[in-house]
UniProtKB/Swiss-Prot annotation:
Residues binding Mg(2+), per UniProt: E41, D70
GO molecular function, one term: nucleotide binding
InterPro entries: dITP/XTP_pyrophosphatase, ITPase-like_fam, RdgB/HAM1
Cofactor-binding details, from the entry: Binds 1 Mg(2+) ion per subunit.
Binding-site residues, substrate: T8, K9, N10, E11, G12, K13, S71, F153, G154, Y155, D156, K176, H181, R182
Protein task: Pyrophosphatase that catalyzes the hydrolysis of nucleoside triphosphates to their monophosphate derivatives, with a high preference for the non-canonical purine nucleotides XTP (xanthosine triphosphate), dITP (deoxyinosine triphosphate) and ITP. Seems to function as a house-cleaning enzyme that removes non-canonical purine nucleotides from the nucleotide pool, thus preventing their incorporation into DNA/RNA and avoiding chromosomal lesions.
Homology family: Belongs to the HAM1 NTPase family.
Protein name: dITP/XTP pyrophosphatase
Amino acid sequence: MKEVIIATKNEGKVREFKAMLEPRGYDVKSLLDIGYTPEIEETGQTFEENAVIKAETISKETGKIVIADDSGLSVDYLGGSPGVYSARYAGEEKNDLANLKKLLKELEGVEKEDRSARFRCALAICIPGQETKTVEGSVEGYITEEPRGTNGFGYDPVFLVKDKDQTMAELSSGEKNKISHRAEALKKLSALLDQA
């Protein structure tokens, strides 16, 4: 079984990666699993830049294959915000509930057709001795007026998936892992991972 380190401490992301990679024969480890505690400063201006920073930092320190994810929510009405600041939208402390409240407050009174949004995910894979490669995935939808569902994490309870009458948080893990922005990016990354 090939070990792959996922450059995150986010348990929700780790669960999604494990569900998608372990059946394919990969031993998935998070930063917490390997005892890595320092914060990696995300200084990039794009999801892709931040994913590369994280993947290269961890791969350089461990000498292992590393996949890094930088993802977030882009709301058209808000000019693409929260974007790369999705996790810290309501402040430096990463707080899902505070982020949701801030987003919903900013969209108060905005009609559904103007609440279009997308989840975006950039994945970077750093294989020691090779050039870091990136892929992206996205899923379109709308922001609801209030949270719905208890599955998932982050903005999932307010993200109504286009062509479905369910938020990401109302989908089962299996359903979400078929259509999510991360799943789309991971499908693209699979060929690169298999070459490792």
